Amino acid sequence: MSPLFSIITVTYNAEKVLERTLRSVAEQSYARIEYIVIDGASTDGTMEMVTSYKSQSPGLVRFEVISEPDKGLYDAMNKGLRVATGDYVWFLNAGDTLQSPETVARLAEVAERNGMPDI
């Protein structure tokens, strides 16, 4: 079976930069992606944007959103790791993007071809 990729994005008041990140995940051609957004209780429009993308992303295996105060970046990252179920975990920062719609598919192909190594 093809590997499941958990992509985790940690946010806090990232409304101005987050859309391109969400779009790059939603546009992936690879079907076995769970996307986890950990938000530190943003006060801008971050959560509205995330909620909108969640409803527009039926192709993802799972789209998990947690929005609550945290104790900083590493606490938020650890929250994401605790809920991730993928064979591979990828942190994609708010404002960053996946290079192309084929990025995860290419990684999955290499992983499968090489016996699912740690990468």
Walk through the language-model features, giving the residues of each.
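Nucleotide-sugar donor-binding/catalytic module of glycosyltransferases
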Residues: 1-119
